[in-house]
Regions:
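Short, small-residue alpha-helix embedded
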Residues: 403, 483-522
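Glycine/charged-rich beta-loop-alpha catalytic/anionic-binding loops adjacent to active sites
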Residues: 16-23, 55-57, 138-139, 272-278, ...
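Glycine-rich phosphate/dinucleotide-binding loop and adjoining beta-alpha-beta core of small-molecule
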Residues: 2-8, 46-245, 303-476
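Radical SAM [4Fe-4S] cluster-binding motif and immediate context
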Residues: 265-327
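Generic hydrophobic/aromatic pocket-lining and core-packing "Φ" positions
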Residues: 34, 71-74, 289-293, 361
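Short glycine/threonine-rich catalytic loop with a Thr-x-Gly-x-Asp
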Residues: 29-30, 66, 225-228, 265-273, ...
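Positively charged, low-complexity intrinsically disordered leader regions
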Residues: 1-53, 227-267
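Charged C-terminal helix
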Residues: 319, 524-554
Length: 554
């Protein structure tokens, strides 16, 4: 996969570094990292100011190698004519880095009260950073855990408050470009969390415009919610990539779609391209059926068979006369969009569609038919599912699913074993939406463990968890994609992919996760194409899918 971004956890990176460090190459590794960091800053300065000479660069310097990288880079930038300032935040400082920056024309100050440099008040350091062209966040690296503390934490808080509501990278802005050194300080390196965050805020982290990371991307640069603080990610090769092993997180890029998207040949007939069965929509929500059908038809599936109430069937046929209404042989199912059994009494007309969902899901599992289970289907799942069943909840739906599963485990220990995860933060011990949004990877993994299914957790960064530790994190759509019905279109697109590659999906338990990531990528890019830079509707996203796919395949 040519464009794929691979994320490796802190332990993997340290293990890959170890042979080089043992061989005495620590100084060379740091020089490569600092050189790559300085080069990235030079590019930012040229783009913003047209030159490096005279530009102001402030480095927030912590302890250890992260601070050393920052100090060496500041020395290199000073040698290029930049007005470099190193702000030390701790008594401990990387000795070789400090020596290098002192040999240059860079100025060194401290806010930690030590005698290593000129002492300045915290407010002075914040003012210098706020007035700079570039700020380097070199406070914490991959060996740190938790929020930034002490003087560094106060710097992050105060500077972050000044910058939080501003557009830092707009053309002509006088505000600094924040460049994170390896990772934004204070994020959860391996799980993408924001320690200490309340209500989704990024108060304990200085959000970066660019993160220059060394050797390989780290999970926090790809996973939500921390990915929102990383900005654009640049990977600097420092020489240990071959020793990294299996990635912890994968992000597919547009160049990867062609290797996974099913393309028909001259002799391919409609049945070979896949037949998707669709159980979606109700009399109250016929639009969900139309949107899911649109996603599937426009993603190129060979045929769609629709099962549902007459009013929804008529709406589907009006939009897509090629859809066949009625049961029949299918290669995959897409079920549940627009159906909410938790809100419908048994006497409601919706009950017939709910029972249809139950029957189809049982049939799919019994006969090894790949299935997308969305919305209403999530409340009807059996105890265990194969990985070729893909669940597609948003955060609220995943919270409800997990709450129900964990309560069942506590009330039926004889069936599931004693113990298990602790209760949630809700007043009744339920898992809350806020918990899922704060730790998406954790809860998506738990859902996979509890059900056996592949889990696609929808969000600004969509997280996919599959068997054998497979994790994908896709951030392809604009914020405008958060609109009614967009998830129904995604259900149809993914259903089309599963139908087109059904035999392979059943044979290879990891393929469903890869196809789910591809569906999220195409769905997000279709939203961009539907109306670049502006609002979109779900139907417009579906309409943009064919051209989006064509562009990705050529």
């Amino acid at each position: 996969m040519s464009g794929v971004i691979l994320g490796y956890d802190a332990h993997q990176v340290r293990e890959a570094e170890e042979p080089l460090l043992t061989a005495g190459a620590e100084g060379e590794l740091m020089h490569r990292a600092a050189f790559g960091l300085a080069g990235a800053v030079v590019r930012e300065l040229v783009a913003r100011r047209g030159r490096v000479r005279g530009a102001s660069v402030v480095g927030l310097v912590g302890t250890g190698n992260n601070g050393g990288d920052t100090l060496h880079a500041l020395a290199m930038l000073a040698d290029r004519g930049a007005r470099a300032l190193a702000v030390l935040t701790d008594e401990r400082v990387h000795a070789a880095g400090l020596a290098a920056v002192r040999r240059s024309s860079a100025r060194v100050v401290t806010v930690s009260g030590t005698g290593q440099a000129e002492r300045v008040w915290l407010g002075e350091a914040v003012a210098e950073a706020y007035a700079a062209d570039v700020v380097l966040d070199g406070l914490l690296g991959i060996g740190a855990r938790g929020v930034v503390r002490g003087s560094g934490g106060e710097l992050v808080r105060l500077l972050g408050e000044l910058l939080r509501d501003e557009v830092r990278t707009a053309p002509g802005t006088d505000l600094p470009c924040v460049v994170a050194v390896d990772v934004p300080s204070g994020v959860g390196i391996d799980d993408g969390t924001l320690p200490g965050a309340v209500g989704g805020a990024i108060g304990h982290v200085l959000p970066a415009d660019v993160t220059v990371t060394f050797g390989a991307a780290k999970p926090c640069l790809l996973l939500p919610p921390a990915a929102a603080a990383a900005g654009r990610v640049e990977v600097v090769d420092i020489g240990f990539r071959p020793g990294l092993g299996v990635p912890t997180v994968v992000r597919l890029e547009p160049a990867d779609v062609a290797a996974l998207w099913p393309v028909p040949g001259p002799a391919t007939h409609k049945y070979a391209r896949g037949v998707l069965g669709l159980v979606a929509g109700t009399a109250a929500y016929p639009g969900a059926a139309v949107l899911a059908a649109s996603g599937a038809v426009l993603a190129g599936v060979g045929m769609v068979r629709y099962l549902g109430p007459d009013v929804a069937a008529r709406a589907v046929l009006a939009a897509h006369p090629e859809v066949v209404v009625g049961d029949g042989r299918v290669q995959a199912w897409a079920i549940g969009s627009g159906v909410d059994p938790t809100l419908m009494p048994a006497t409601d007309p919706t009950a017939e569609q709910v029972e249809r969902l139950r029957r189809v899901l049982a049939r799919a599992v019994a006969h090894s038919v790949p299935t997308v289970a969305d919305a209403g289907a999530l409340a009807l799942l059996p105890d265990r599912l194969p990985p070729w069943v893909v669940l597609t909840p948003h955060a609220g739906e995943l919270a409800r699913l997990l709450t129900a599963r964990l309560r069942e485990r506590r009330t039926r220990p004889e069936a599931h074993g004693a113990g298990g995860p602790a209760a949630g933060d809700g007043p009744d011990g339920s898992i809350t939406r806020a918990q899922v949004e704060a730790e998406p990877l954790r809860w998506a993994r738990l859902a996979h463990d509890l059900t056996g299914a592949t889990v696609l957790l929808k969000g600004a960064v969509t997280v996919v968890v599959g068997p054998q530790g497979a994790v994908y994190a896709q951030a392809d759509g604009p914020a405008w994609l958060a609109t009614a019905g967009a998830g129904d279109v995604l259900t149809g697109v993914l259903g089309a992919l599963l139908a087109s590659r059904a035999t392979e999906v059943v044979e290879d338990p990891t393929l469903a996760a890869a196809l789910a990531a591809v569906a999220a990528l195409v769905h997000g890019r279709a939203a961009h194409h539907a109306n670049p830079g502006g609002p979109v509707t779900a139907l417009a996203v579906a309409a943009a899918v064919p051209a989006t796919v064509a562009g990705l395949l050529t």
